[in-house]
From Swiss-Prot:
Protein name: Uncharacterized protein DDB_G0279687
Pro residues biased stretches: 59-69
Compositional bias of kind Basic and acidic residues: 36-58
Disordered: annotated segments: 31-89
Length: 89
């Protein structure tokens, strides 16, 4: 067992493994690394897929609901007379 005096003035009893962890955590001082000069990224070169300023817009009149499917009208699918229920006489 080892005795360590903390910053607040209290004494702590620490086991052998605890003292190794204590030393590893609190006694290693990292020296500040000098900042390396960094290069500014080069601007992207325009490619063939970029829109040109004189190009017309791709979707001139987009619908407010692009995924909406038009509903079929009843006249599009006429029901044959055989399928209508026949009255019982």
């Amino acid at each position: 067992m080892n005795i360590i005096k903390s910053k607040t003035g209290n004494f702590k009893f620490i086991s052998r493994i605890g003292i190794l962890n204590y030393k590893r955590c609190f006694t290693t001082v990292k020296t500040p690394q000098p900042l390396e000069p960094h290069e500014h990224p080069k601007p992207m070169e325009p490619n063939e897929f970029d829109p040109k300023p004189d190009d017309p817009p791709r979707n001139p009149d987009p619908s407010p609901f692009p995924n909406e499917v038009p509903k079929p009208k009843p006249s599009d699918f006429p029901i044959p007379d055989e399928l209508y229920p026949q009255p019982i006489v």
